[in-house]
């Protein structure tokens, strides 16, 4: 939105940055909701047209992650930890992302409800 309004992006090497790999697992649902809401607004991209597609997409992604994890030179407990993390993170990605991607199809009342209860951007604007 800011770029569309004519603002410019600049790089500042001294600016504090909070990278996504530093987020808590509990914040990803809201992050993906906001991200895919924006991806639809800009590119009309939706990861899934219907929620019934999500189990297949989720299983495929978690399987791929687990195949990668199995190849890593780490202990069995650590592999299990990362496999569980993958399951939860990908659940957040697919459900939060699909909710956000379908945002344009919801009534105004539902949009407000979802923004109020999920969106990180909504909370940041209200702060």
Predicted regions located by residue number:
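Short, exposed beta-strand "edge-strand" segments with a Pro/Gly-rich flavor and a Y/T-containing core
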Residues: 17-23, 68-73
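A short, conserved alpha-helix in the catalytic core of glycosyltransferases
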Residues: 1-16
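Generic hydrophobic, helix-prone segments enriched in Leu/Val/Ile
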Residues: 7-8, 25, 54, 58
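Non-catalytic, C-terminal membrane-associated alpha-helical segments of glycosyltransferases
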Residues: 34, 49-127
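Nucleotide-sugar-dependent glycosyltransferase catalytic core
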Residues: 18-40, 113, 117
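Cytosolic juxtamembrane regions of integral membrane proteins
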Residues: 41-48
């Amino acid at each position: 939105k800011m770029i569309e309004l004519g603002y410019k992006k600049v790089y500042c090497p001294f600016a504090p940055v909070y990278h996504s790999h530093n987020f808590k697992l509990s914040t990803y649902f809201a992050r993906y909701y906001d991200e895919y809401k924006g991806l639809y607004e800009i590119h009309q991209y939706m990861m899934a047209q219907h929620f019934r597609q999500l189990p297949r997409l989720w299983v495929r992604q978690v399987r791929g992650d687990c195949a990668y994890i199995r190849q890593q030179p780490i202990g069995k407990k650590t592999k299990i930890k990362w496999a569980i993390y993958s399951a939860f993170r990908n659940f957040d990605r697919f459900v939060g992302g699909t909710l956000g991607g379908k945002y344009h199809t919801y009534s105004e009342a539902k949009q407000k409800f979802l923004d109020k209860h999920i969106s990180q951007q909504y909370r940041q604007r209200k702060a």
